[in-house]
Amino acid sequence: MPIKKPCLKLNLDSLNVVRSEIPQMLSANERLKNNFNILYNQIRQYPAYYFKVASNVPNYSDICQFFSVMYQGFQIVNHSGDVFIHACRENPQSKGDFVGDKFHISIAREQVPLAFQILSGLLFSEDSPIDKWKITDMNRVSQQSRVGIGAQFTLYVKSDQECSQYSALLLHKIRQFIMCLESNLLRSKIAPGEYPASDVRPEDWKYVSYRNELRSDRNGSERQEQMLREEPFYRLMIE
């Protein structure tokens, strides 16, 4: 006599209901796109921001000799096996995540030490919105290396809100900070370096350029350039 097997039927309808009730997680970039107009209008309501310039800052030859030292709240690290000198704020002002947004500053090779002297008061400023940055040790790179002819400074931007978002105030401070860096270099008649093919910049930026390192690569391309120019963070910096 054949044994009757129980009829087991999986109720897929109930699974579909559960799945449909789970909200789709937006990426940090998508959230920034969705909030673009709000942030754009809020940024324009803030007055000009004036950064307190740090005093008693090290010069370029000093940081090339340091191994690890604390200066103006920044830990400076210079390892012999690295072509970069790294600076990281001990108590970060922005508590969010790094979502790939960064700036390069490109200087003529022979003027990098002077450019550092001009910018160091801002880079070490307690008002600086940049918690982490690095600079090329020019003694360790070849004449024509990518970070020898340009992109000697890298400024890393961190978010300050939940879900890796930026507040309008932080975006405003970053915009103003970039303007100060540019104007200080221009006023001192520093010669620009070769800005990276991987980056984008508006016509009025002579030294600073932008890249999101999570959605681009170092080689660059027309497609990548177009994509970076459409990045909401970049647009909020220049528009």
UniProtKB/Swiss-Prot annotation:
Function: Catalyzes the removal of the phosphate group from the phosphothreonine in the mitogen-activated protein kinases such as MAPK2/ERK2, MAPK3/ERK1, MAPK8 and MAPK14 in an irreversible reaction, thus preventing the downstream phosphorylation of histone H3. This epigenetic modification results in inhibition of the transcription of a specific subset of pro-inflammatory genes, and ultimately to a reduced immune response against the invading pathogen. The diminished immune response enhances the bacterium's ability to disseminate and multiply within the host.
Active site as annotated: 104 (proton donor), 134 (proton acceptor)
One annotated Gene Ontology cellular component of this protein: extracellular region
Coiled coil: none
Class in the EC hierarchy, top level: lyase
Keyword Chloroplast among record annotations: no
This protein's name: Phosphothreonine lyase OspF
Domain of life assignment: Bacteria
Pfam families: VRP3
UniProt keywords, alphabetically: Lyase, Plasmid, Secreted, Virulence
Organism phylogeny: Bacteria, Pseudomonadati, Pseudomonadota, Gammaproteobacteria, Enterobacterales
Family: Belongs to the phosphothreonine lyase family.
Major site of localization recorded for this protein: secreted
Subcellular location as annotated: Secreted
One GO MF term attached to the UniProt entry: lyase activity
E.C. code: 4.2.3.-
